[in-house]
Structures are given as C-alpha cells and as structure tokens.
C-alpha cells in the first residue's frame, strides 16, 4: 500500500521465521539471502542488483544485527529493521542505550532501525484478546522509500506519512522524538491525524554526517553501482588520452542527468579520473558531490583493478566528507 503501486516489480520474498534469520549456529537462511544479494551485485552487469533489504521485527543481539549490517553494506543495499516492541518512550531510550546498537562502524550506515510499532488491528474482546495487535514499521517505511525520490528522506508531515495506519504503540512528545532521533532510531509518530516516520538517521554515529543520513547513503550507493556497471563495460580498453576524455564525458553526462531540484544531487565535480602511474592496471576516480540533505560536500572515491580472471574488474568505493 505504501509503494503506491498496483504491483511491485523486482521483489523477492523469503518465508522465514525470525528464529531462522537470527540463528548464527545454523545460518541457512542468512547464507541464502547473502548469496542472493551477492549473486546480483558481484557481477559485471548490475542492472538486476537489489536496493533494499527488509527484515521486519527485532533481530536481537549486536552479533546478529552486525552480521546483517555487514551483508547489506558489502552488497550496497539498505537494511530496514525494527527495535523491540516496547510500551513507553522511556523504555525505548533505556533499552536502546544499553543495547548499544548504533556505532561508528561503516556498515552501520546501511542500517535503518524503526521504533514505536504500528497498530495492525484493534483487539477482539469477544475472543478474549487483551491487547491490540501491533506490527513492526520497517515494511511500511520500506514501501514508502520505494515510492519516494531517492534523495528525499521519508520523514515528516509531507513525505513521511504512512498509508492505512491508524495509530502507534505510544504517543511521543517533541522532546522525546528529538532524543530518540539523536540516538539513531527512526520513531513512528502519530500527529496531524496521520502516522509518519520522523527521522532520516542510520545507526552510524561517526563523524561523517552523510553516512548518518540514509538518503545520502542510498544515493551514493546508487551512483557507485551505476559507475561500477559502466566502467565494467569499458574494462580492458587501452588507456589513452582519448579513452580518458571519453570516460570523463560519459560520467559527466550521467551525473548531469541526476543533478537538479527534482533529482538526486545538488551539484558535482569530477576531480580525478586517471590511470595509476605506478600500477598501470589500476584506475582512480574521485567525484566531489553535494547532496541535498545534509548540505555538506562529500567525495566518492572509486578504485578499480583488473581481476585474476579474463574480463574481470574489481571495484572498491569509499565515501568521505569534504573537509
């Protein structure tokens, strides 16, 4: 319902219990999903790669959350999941602080964790139910992210509203929303007669402001994957001034197509595209990009090398905040 589509394209659904997704001793389902993501990312043609990985509910310990976060980060997908279903804002703050889920590890930038579960349906008193049925918010948020421009965070009154959701587990005051948001969670809020997400945060709390903001991470991952795909198609061409000029022209053309108020980035500059003078099979590419939010400048650094197999090229990316 939140995808605003009659039918969602390019989706894979895995029928698994939470116990199966959190079993590190017998990681059959973890390995299956990891292999599915890798199969569509670790290849030359990236047109069928995934963008979102949704695991509704609470994964539990940091060992499990980090396992999934590393899988998401290594395949450049955004993991959406949920914190525990607790009954008060104070419980969320206390338990999340003690759980220590946020951190400065780079893979935390690929994790979105919601809190304050959504009302699924009212309790049925006639059959002895004592509480309403509450469901995790990550799936609804993922649908909204799917249908929203990648550079726009799904948060606030205009863009964060969720379809067909009547209420949440508990009400939140403005100060409580701010405290929960600062911790790295995405609270679900019932205000203005609608339920909405009210944060743009990932679980990354390091110095790089862009990696704290999921729209920036998604845009950078998308740009990196497009460039990986494009450069893979140009692998093993002899490096000449004409090759360099042609690559630069094509990259600028792509970046120009995603620049502007209704697109993905505010502005860009290709700072470097060159062959490593000391290692001829290595290509270095630095792009200076300013996303719309936050209003900071960042550098995407791509490094490519010829692989061991014919027609194989290995690419690595790094996102750094411009000083």
Placement of each model-derived feature along the sequence:
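Structured, hydrophobic secondary-structure cores that serve as assembly/anchoring elements
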Residues: 39-323
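Long, low-complexity, polar/charged, intrinsically disordered or flexibly structured peripheral segments
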Residues: 1-32, 37
């Amino acid at each position: 319902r939140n995808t605003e589509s009659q039918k969602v394209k390019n989706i894979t659904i895995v029928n698994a219990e939470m116990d199966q997704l959190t079993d590190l001793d017998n990681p059959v389902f973890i390995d299956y999903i990891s292999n599915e993501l890798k199969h569509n990312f670790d290849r030359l043609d990236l047109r069928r790669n995934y963008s979102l990985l949704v695991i509704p509910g609470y994964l539990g310990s940091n060992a499990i959350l980090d396992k999934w976060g590393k899988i998401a980060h290594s395949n450049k997908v955004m993991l959406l999941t949920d914190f525990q279903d607790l009954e008060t804002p104070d419980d969320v703050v206390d338990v999340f602080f003690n759980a220590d889920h946020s951190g400065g590890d780079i893979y935390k930038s690929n994790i979105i964790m919601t809190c304050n579960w959504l009302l699924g349906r009212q309790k049925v008193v006639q059959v002895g139910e004592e509480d309403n049925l509450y469901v995790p918010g990550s799936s609804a948020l993922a649908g909204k992210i799917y249908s929203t421009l990648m550079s726009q965070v799904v948060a606030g009154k205009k863009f964060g509203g969720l379809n067909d959701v009547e209420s949440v587990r508990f009400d939140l005051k403005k100060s409580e929303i701010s405290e929960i948001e600062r911790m790295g969670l995405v609270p679900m809020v019932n205000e203005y007669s609608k339920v909405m997400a009210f944060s743009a945060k990932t679980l990354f709390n390091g110095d790089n402001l862009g990696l704290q903001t999921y729209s920036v991470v998604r845009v950078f991952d998308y740009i990196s994957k497009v460039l990986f795909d494009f450069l893979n198609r140009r692998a093993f061409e002899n490096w000449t001034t004409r090759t360099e000029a042609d690559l630069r022209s094509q990259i600028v053309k792509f970046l120009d197509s995603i620049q502007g108020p209704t697109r993905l980035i505010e502005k860009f500059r290709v700072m470097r595209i060159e062959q490593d003078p000391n290692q001829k099979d290595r290509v270095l590419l630095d792009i200076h990009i300013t996303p719309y939010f936050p209003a900071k400048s960042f550098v995407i650094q791509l490094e490519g090398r010829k692989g061991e197999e014919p027609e194989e090229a290995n690419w690595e990316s790094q996102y750094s905040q411009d000083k």
